[in-house]
């Protein structure tokens, strides 16, 4: 505190210096008045010492309180009260008493219980308040040059100043709490080297949710009360020709001639919502007649309710009706809900119709998809619209972008992400009115070439389609939103400060109650904002249209060779060093890969072992030391080419399961999925060995042939019994309803990979009961990976985490110790974790004891409630499934009955048990 502001220093009377009093306003024009005020304060202190009662000060202080004062700021940053200048002496007296009396009270009262109690009553409650302010650098200029808006937070005697990006730009302490509590609009305050002026009060709810930082972001324009009437032009003679062109002038003169393309009053018609007055004021300045936009009945009659809702949602987004000035949308429906059909309906409608004067909204549309889905999109256009209504151009090796430019016949271009980068210069020269990105979650990294290229396109109307929206990685979530609606959430730094950091901090175990509350409110506000242009529905909306689905988690007993090799690997020096925390160069990932190969088949491990022995110059020293001594465990005559199913527990189960399907349902077919090409080679040899006809699609399959392979397999005349599928190459977007059995041979760290692969068969067009089998080796790393999957998501697959987990995961030493443990004495570690006492004889499903939470579209998956159970919520849902031990006398499922000798445990869940099937 600066003594230079004391009254005695201001008066220059150093010889007769009174006891120090906290500074008040000094006025060089009124020295006599200030001297009187100082003497008055000394008298007040003497009275206080004599009576020892704080109430006397309160009475004397309250008598001189003024009702008419305004706030001003001294250069020291203290708030002061300035009386309206009716009287100079009154002003000075009131001002000095207002500021110095409470301090004198605190300094000179005796420390009696009554005094302490009175002081406690006068102590402020330290309530936190929020204000919207303007700020600038401190100066003595009369006309300030304000540099920007900010948020002022006051609590007790301290203040924090945040800019509109959430960054702290100023802090201060030592202010008078009563003066901070009385801040009002128009008052000023010094904070550090900055001067602020209060603009208004912000509610605590607006600050907690982050709405106060959204200045101008995602707000709707004010709706005018009435639209101005269009000035009609002077009458002119009509054109004699019967074919009068529909120019803007003719439409204005004869608005009755502009009618909807289809009848909006039909019973099953799908009519788009009309724009409100604000939208018309912005986009219909010419005053064209507003016409109903009706989806072609040729399509509308085949749409399901959720698809009709999706088309309306997309229409409102791309027309700018949901968020002012933004024309993007994210359709995040689960796989199989018809995202392709909804987009085709939207494109066809906007290519032929428009809400203002019947003028079509689109001239050209660009659809970017993975290479394996280019022909599938073209096929869907032909399926729903035929080849006469619309011409679709697909870019491939034989059809270049130049042909699309030179031909007026095509209004829709379909191109793969890879081909887009090759033809980027030609694409940028074309004016597209709508951009659709299928499997758009690959755009979650804003720095990759594909995202940069698409962002640079001039098209404002953008739609992302993804069946697996990102939920946990908020920066990737921001990248998708920024692509479709740039700037709707502000800059990346603003997003991090306002949303990401509070939300992530609230999920940490050490988070305080305030941090958790703030994180929940920020997450709710982020959900509200993004809900304006993100729509997500789960597969539950079409379950009633699909046949029953039986999902089986099968735990396969490992063979003696697998157990011996597994023990040998776990005792290696590499794994021991991992468990001691030596994780340089990620040796634990090599160990995990070796254990996964062993679970699939020992021959895969043997092949890797031989490759390292034949290549001593290899820099994979860690892998070579991991395989040390494994050769002695394999039989002497063992080779990777002469493998047998007797060496792998999962392969034994697979062989028996395929035989049971062939015998019991000879007309049904199987999709066999693996994450690895080497494993697919083993499965292919197994098919050859048992004479099963097959077809295969993996990363080596040419993109131009993939759709033909899928169509051939789906045909009822297909001779193939098994479809060998690589989940990494073709597990996304393919429709394999020609099969009713799907076997997932191995497991991936990323649950989305497995869920997408399993969704290939249970979707629209499927007529038979669907059987899904997930094979896991009991007690091994595969069971641990499965537990890790279901601890992050619901078993129904409603929402998945698409953060790039893969195998580049950070593990703690404790997690690695759990992964590198072989449980030989348990029939199912997962069932043991459930603490279920059914003894593997639970042949019924329990109804959910908890009401399922209703979640909004693309809701951030924060924990909605707290539970004391150590089991994750999704893990506990396994209690609702059927539990079967391998020792079960008679399994109700005939396919499972054939394989139970090689199985230790089974979880089964049946969906749509009452649906009619063939």
Curated annotation (Swiss-Prot):
Residues 653-817 form the Helicase C-terminal domain. The keyword Cell wall biogenesis/degradation does not apply. Residues 1-29, 842-873 are annotated as: Disordered. GO terms for cellular component: nucleus. One of its GO terms (molecular function) is hydrolase activity. It holds the Pfam family SNF2-rel_dom. Its main location: nucleus. Keywords: ATP-binding, DNA damage, DNA repair, DNA-binding, Helicase, Hydrolase, Nucleotide-binding, Nucleus. ATP binds at residues 333-340. It is found in: Nucleus. SMART domains: DEXDc, HELICc. Its EC number is 3.6.4.-. A motif (DEGH box) lies at residues 438-441. It is an enzyme of class 3 (hydrolase). InterPro entries: Helicase_ATP-bd (IPR014001), Helicase_C-like (IPR001650), P-loop_NTPase (IPR027417), SNF2-like_sf (IPR038718), SNF2/RAD54-like_C (IPR049730), SNF2_N (IPR000330), SNF2_RAD54_helicase_repair (IPR050496). Involved in DNA repair and mitotic recombination. Belongs to the SNF2/RAD54 helicase family. This is DNA repair and recombination protein RAD54B. The gene is RAD54B.
């Amino acid at each position: 505190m600066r003594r230079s502001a004391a009254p005695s220093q201001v008066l220059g009377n150093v010889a007769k210096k009174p006891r120090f009093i906290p500074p008040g306003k000094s006025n060089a024009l009124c020295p006599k008045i200030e001297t009187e005020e100082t003497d008055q304060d000394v008298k007040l202190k003497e009275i206080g010492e004599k009576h020892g009662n704080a109430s006397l000060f309160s009475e004397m202080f309250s008598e001189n309180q003024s009702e008419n004062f305004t706030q001003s700021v001294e250069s020291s940053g203290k708030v002061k009260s300035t009386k309206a200048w009716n009287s100079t002496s009154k002003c000075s007296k009131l001002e000095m008493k207002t500021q110095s009396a409470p301090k004198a009270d605190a300094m000179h009262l005796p420390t009696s219980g009554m005094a302490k109690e009175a002081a406690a009553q006068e102590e402020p409650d330290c309530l936190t308040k929020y204000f919207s302010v303007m700020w600038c650098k401190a100066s003595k200029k009369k006309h300030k040059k304000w540099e920007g808006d900010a948020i002022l937070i006051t609590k007790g005697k301290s203040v924090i100043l945040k800019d509109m990006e959430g960054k702290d730009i100023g802090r201060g302490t030592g202010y008078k709490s009563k003066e901070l509590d009385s801040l009002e609009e128009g008052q000023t305050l010094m904070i550090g080297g900055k001067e602020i002026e209060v603009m208004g009060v912000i509610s605590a709810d607006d600050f907690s949710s982050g709405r106060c930082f959204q200045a101008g972001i995602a707000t709707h324009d004010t709706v005018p009360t009435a639209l101005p009437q269009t000035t009609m032009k002077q009458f002119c003679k009509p054109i004699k020709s019967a074919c009068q062109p529909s120019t803007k002038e003719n439409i204005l003169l004869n608005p009755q001639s502009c009618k909807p393309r289809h009848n909006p009053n039909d019973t099953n018609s799908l009519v788009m919502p009309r724009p409100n007055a604000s939208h018309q004021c912005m986009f219909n300045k010419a005053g064209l007649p507003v016409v109903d936009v009706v989806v072609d009945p040729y399509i509308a009659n085949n749409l399901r309710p959720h698809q009709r809702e999706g088309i309306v949602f997309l229409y409102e987004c791309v027309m700018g009706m949901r968020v002012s000035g933004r024309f993007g949308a994210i359709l995040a429906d689960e796989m199989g809900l018809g995202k392709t059909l909804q987009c085709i309906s939207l494109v066809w409608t906007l290519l032929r119709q428009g809400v203002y004067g019947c003028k079509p909204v689109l001239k050209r549309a660009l659809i970017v998809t993975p290479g394996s889905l280019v022909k599938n999109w073209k096929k869907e256009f032909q399926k729903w619209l035929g080849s006469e209504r619309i011409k679709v151009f697909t870019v491939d090796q034989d059809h270049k972008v130049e042909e699309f430019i030179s031909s007026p016949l095509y209004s829709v271009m379909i191109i793969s992400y890879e081909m887009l980068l090759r033809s980027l210069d030609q694409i940028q020269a074309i004016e597209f009115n709508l951009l659709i990105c299928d499997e758009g979650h690959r755009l979650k990294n804003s720095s990759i070439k594909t995202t940069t290229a698409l962002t640079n396109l001039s098209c404002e109307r953008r739609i992302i389609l993804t069946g697996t929206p990102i939920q946990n990685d908020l920066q990737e979530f921001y990248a998708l939103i920024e692509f479709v609606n740039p700037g709707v959430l502000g800059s990346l730094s603003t997003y991090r400060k306002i949303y990401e950091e509070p939300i992530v901090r609230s999920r940490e175990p050490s988070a305080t109650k305030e941090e958790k509350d703030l994180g929940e409110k920020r997450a709710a506000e982020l959900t509200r904002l993004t809900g304006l242009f993100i729509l997500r529905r789960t597969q539950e909306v079409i379950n009633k249209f699909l046949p029953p689905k039986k999902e089986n988690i099968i735990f396969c007993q490992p063979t003696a060779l697998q157990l011996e090799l597994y023990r040998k690997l776990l005792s290696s020096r590499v794994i021991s060093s991992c468990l001691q925390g030596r994780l340089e160069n990620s040796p634990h990932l090599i160990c995990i890969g070796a254990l996964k190969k062993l679970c699939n088949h020992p021959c895969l491990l043997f092949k890797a072992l031989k490759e390292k022995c034949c290549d001593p110059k290899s820099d994979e020293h860690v892998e070579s030391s991991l395989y040390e001594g494994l050769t002695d465990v394999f039989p002497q005559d063992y080779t990777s080419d002469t493998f047998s199913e007797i060496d792998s527990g999962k392969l034994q189960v697979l062989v028996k399961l395929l035989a049971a399907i062939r015998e019991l349902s000879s007309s049904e077919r199987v999709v066999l999925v693996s994450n690895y090409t080497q494993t697919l080679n083993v499965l292919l040899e197994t098919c050859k060995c048992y004479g099963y006809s097959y077809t295969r699609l993996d990363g080596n399959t040419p993109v131009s042939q993939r759709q033909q392979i899928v169509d051939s397999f789906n045909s009822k005349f297909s001779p193939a019994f098994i479809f060998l599928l690589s989940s990494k190459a073709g597990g996304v977007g393919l429709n394999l309803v020609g099969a009713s059995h799907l076997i997932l041979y191995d497991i991936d760290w990323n649950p989305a990979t497995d869920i997408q692969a399993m969704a290939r068969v249970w979707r629209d067009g499927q007529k038979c009961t669907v059987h899904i089998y997930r094979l896991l080796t009991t007690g091994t790393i595969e069971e641990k990976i499965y537990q890790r999957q279901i601890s992050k998501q619901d078993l129904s697959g409603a929402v998945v985490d698409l953060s790039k987990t893969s195998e580049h995961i950070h593990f703690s030493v404790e997690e690695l110790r759990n992964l590198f443990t072989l449980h030989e004495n348990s029939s199912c570690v997962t069932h043991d974790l459930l603490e279920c006492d059914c003894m593997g004889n639970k042949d019924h499903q329990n109804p959910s004891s908890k009401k399922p939470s209703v979640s909004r579209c693309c809701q951030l998956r924060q924990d909605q409630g707290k539970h004391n159970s150590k089991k994750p919520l999704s893990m506990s849902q396994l209690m609702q499934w059927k539990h079967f031990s391998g020792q079960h006398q008679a399994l109700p499922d005939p396919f499972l009955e054939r394989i139970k000798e090689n199985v230790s445990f089974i979880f089964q869940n049946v969906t749509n048990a009452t649906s009619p099937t063939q």
